[in-house]
């Protein structure tokens, strides 16, 4: 039986989660809510994507103001501002992906339950909802948990890598830098940004230092690393694909070749499909459309000595993350 999902917020992640869902045999997308766009514009935004290309799987057309057709399959569209008013139950949506970026608080996301949803997956970090990273701690999920966070794209990249390093060699402490592509909140030209002055500068013309909670969040999904990692970001003028640089001090001395071998082994076994491994001379665009959370770049890393190492891992911060949202729903359904 297919898992029926709804999506609240049809932005970058909402639209890509929809693509993943529509490409999955075990998932049925039944409803989308976005109060700011019409069904006609929703169709256009879904069909054409500057990064991931044109949608060609099914013909997409508007049936009426509240229904889209993917081939002959109807999709119900709402235009509701308040989550508690979304009629998810009527549409048959059991799992709701909260991808507006607004309702990341557990209590605010809980409003979807009032509309008939059974479970809510927040596609962003949350201050108080339990966070799960597929491949790292999803087995901690219990069926009585109704609201979860899929953490951030960067945490999804860093956590599997940190898990392997910590399991095999032990991490004493580490600093992470993510070189991160442009996202929707960035400015096209210099503009007001009172909370983050640098973040208000033109994204296409600058390398912008920024804060990120991604490294600290690893401590939430891997308690053994709580307090051992922190990090920052450089926002750069690329539209998709980002890269994590983790510099760590190890408890157990290891050569860089031993570290590579450990990561390669896990990428082929317990973390297959989540953690990748490459020895090719790759650059960022080589990972557009890569569904894995984290692809370790064996040639990019370096060790100073047996206990001090820098490891580098790529991620499609849009497509990889959207695939994990669906994977998390699959896992939740298997537990329920």
From Swiss-Prot:
Stated EC number for the protein is: 1.2.1.12
Protein's GO biological process: glucose metabolic process; glycolytic process
**Annotated signal sequence range:** none
- The transmembrane segments are none
The UniProt entry lists the main location of this chain as cytoplasm
Q: Which NCBIfam families match?
A: GAPDH-I
Would you tell me the protein name for this molecule?
Glyceraldehyde-3-phosphate dehydrogenase, cytosolic
